[in-house]
């Protein structure tokens, strides 16, 4: 997995697939979330400083890299490059989130939608852009089912980054102008 964001999902994937869970990256815990850092060059440089590979986990192996999400694709692309540089034969990539195609209007400072790797691209095009041999995104309905389990309680999730549907809307300034 990509530490630490992909670890929980990677553990469950390994169990479900019946394969041994392995970690091939070591994380520098003093580097923050790269997708929210200002400027493309800062983000790219930070990915390399943030992660180092354990070559023995990649050399001559087919690997599945699991991360929590893909926003711009910079981190995913760099991680795939690092796995290949460490000797991976094939690199497969799994995103625990559906494609991010809409901004988060509730407070997370996300880039303009044109900067999202999933904006206007197919999964095959995204796979090619990050340099993976194959990739898969979590389906939104599966993500919701995984979070709710067998619960019969009605639960509403903010899925606006994936489906564009806002839970709450606030009036625009002109709508609230009563004069």
Which residues fall in each region the model found?
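Conserved small/polar residues in nucleotide/adenosyl-binding loops
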Residues: 168-175
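Short, glycine/charge-rich flexible loops or terminal/linker lids adjacent to PRPP-binding catalytic cores
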Residues: 16-64, 74, 101-111
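Phosphate-binding active sites in nucleotide-utilizing proteins
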Residues: 1-7, 11-15, 20-25
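Acidic, metal-coordinating catalytic segment for phosphate/diphosphate chemistry
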Residues: 98-167
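Phosphate/diphosphate-binding loops
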Residues: 61-71, 75, 120-130
């Amino acid at each position: 997995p990509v530490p630490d964001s992909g670890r929980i999902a990677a553990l469950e994937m390994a169990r479900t697939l019946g394969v041994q869970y392995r970690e091939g990256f070591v994380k520098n815990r003093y580097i923050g979330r790269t997708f929210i850092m200002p400027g493309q060059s800062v983000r790219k440089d930070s990915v390399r400083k943030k992660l180092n590979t354990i070559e023995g986990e990649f050399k001559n192996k087919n690997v599945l890299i699991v991360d929590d999400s893909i926003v711009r694709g910079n981190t995913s692309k760099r991680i795939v490059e690092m796995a290949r540089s460490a000797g991976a034969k094939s690199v497969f990539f799994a995103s625990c989130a559906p494609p991010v195609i809409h901004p988060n209007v509730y407070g997370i400072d996300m880039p303009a939608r044109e900067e999202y790797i999933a904006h206007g691209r197919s999964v095959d095009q995204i796979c090619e852009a990050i340099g993976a041999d194959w990739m898969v995104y979590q389906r939104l309905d599966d993500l919701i089912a995984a979070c709710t389990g067998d619960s019969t309680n009605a639960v509403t999730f903010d899925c606006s980054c994936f489906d564009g549907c806002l839970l709450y809307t606030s009036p625009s300034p002109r709508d609230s102008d009563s004069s």
